[in-house]
Amino acid sequence: MLKEEDKIFTNLHGQQSHDLKSSKKRGDWENTKALLDKGRDFIVEEVKKSGLRGRGGAGFSTGMKWSFMPKNLEKSCYLVVNADESEPGTCKDRDILRFEPHKLIEGCLLASFAIGANNCYIYIRGEFYNEASNIQRALDEAYKEGLIGKNSCGSGFDCNIYLHRGAGAYICGEETALLESLEGKKGMPRLKPPFPAGFGLYGCPTTINNVESIAVVPTILRRGASWFAGIGKPNNTGTKIFCISGHVNKPCNVEEAMGISLKELIEKYAGGVRGGWDNLKAIIPGGSSVPLLPKSLCEVDMDFDSLRTAGSGLGTGGIIVMDQSTDIIYAIARLSKFYMHESCGQCTPCREGTGWMWRVMMRLVKGNVTKSEIDELLNVTKAIEGHTICALGDAAAWPIQGLIRHFRSEIEARIKSYSVV
């Protein structure tokens, strides 16, 4: 369990003001110039040593990602913060944007300095109107105080941070589709290589990071890499914001140590499963794009490696709890409709496959399929998985794979009951 003094996001639930004065009282912008004076290599190495892995879902080493940026270039390079949070079941970045905007802005400054970027863009989901307003107010405060802009914090480093609002497309959460949108084009993923670190925004080297990944950086640098690395488990260090929703007594967002038990997380912070743990049916542990886990696997540790071993993934940390009253087949069919709607249509397997899967899933809800079609559906998900430019095809396939893997008997019972009728 995370100690109170180890929490990074002390205003996660908005009990205090999010303005600059209150943020400074909570420790934001404390000796930021001293951190910048330590140099770029120090910041990158410290983040590497901390073991911080991307909090947007991929789990790639943040410090390693920064080190890929070319050095001593004459042309511009950019930092882009992905605040296009659109994953069903996920609302962690939204609370950071609402209640801890200065943590994010200070993190943007430090990360921009570390990679040599004088310009940073925060790409925020279009529907996040109030959150965008809070960020813009915080940016205005930071500019007025000289914390960002020309000679940021008196360090001699110039850093401009811009807020860019998206238009509600889930696909723009994919880093290269986000760059396309930022350039004023249709948000469609790019082929890789070239990777953004070599050819990103406007053809310049670019690093794209998640909101939470950037917001924890100032605290890591102040308290030290060893402090952050001492929380959680080896290779899964630090704290993480988990979003707990669905059939629990008290849905909430909570910051906890990586590696905490899923059961402990739900019972300690969300008041337990509605009707008790025995009433649990399944949990989606990391946002809608990861396979669900049946009750028998729901005492797993919440970290990248443990969940991968269990056949799922940590993803965004969006925990969706489903009790015995859930029509699990319909729940996954509803997710299939989401991915069909959000496919950009660029890749044939995703464009055609997501629609086909949704249509079969809706027949499956009624039981109006043959048993052989279960395997046919599974084969189609595997044909889509890994055969698209971005991971949306995988995200559409994995929930269905998890359903068939763990609830095949329920699907077959549905088919049998339909045939009897």
UniProtKB/Swiss-Prot annotation:
Keyword Acyltransferase: no
Keyword Flavoprotein included in the entry's annotation: yes
SMART domains reported for this sequence: NADH_4Fe-4S
Binding residue positions for [4Fe-4S] cluster: 344, 347, 350, 390
Cofactor(s) it depends on: FMN; [4Fe-4S] cluster
Documented EC number(s): 7.1.1.-
UniProt-annotated binding residues for FMN: 166-213
Cofactor note: Binds 1 FMN.
Highest taxon above the source species: Bacteria
This protein's UniProt keywords: 4Fe-4S, Flavoprotein, FMN, Iron, Iron-sulfur, Metal-binding, NAD, Quinone, Translocase
Catalytic activity of the protein: a quinone + NADH + 5 H(+)(in) = a quinol + NAD(+) + 4 H(+)(out)
GO terms assigned for molecular function: 4 iron, 4 sulfur cluster binding; FMN binding; metal ion binding; NAD binding; NADH dehydrogenase (ubiquinone) activity; quinone binding
Class of enzymatic activity (EC top level): translocase
Binding site for NAD(+): 54-63
Pfam families, sorted: Complex1_51K (PF01512), NADH_4Fe-4S (PF10589), SLBB_2 (PF22461)
Function: NDH-1 shuttles electrons from NADH, via FMN and iron-sulfur (Fe-S) centers, to quinones in the respiratory chain. Couples the redox reaction to proton translocation (for every two electrons transferred, four hydrogen ions are translocated across the cytoplasmic membrane), and thus conserves the redox energy in a proton gradient.
Record-stated family: Belongs to the complex I 51 kDa subunit family.
Miscellaneous information on this protein: Belongs to an operon consisting of at least secF-nuoF-lepB-rnc.
Name by which UniProt lists this protein: NADH-quinone oxidoreductase subunit F
Organism: Rickettsia rickettsii (strain Sheila Smith)
Lineage of origin: Bacteria, Pseudomonadati, Pseudomonadota, Alphaproteobacteria, Rickettsiales
Protein encoded by which gene: nuoF
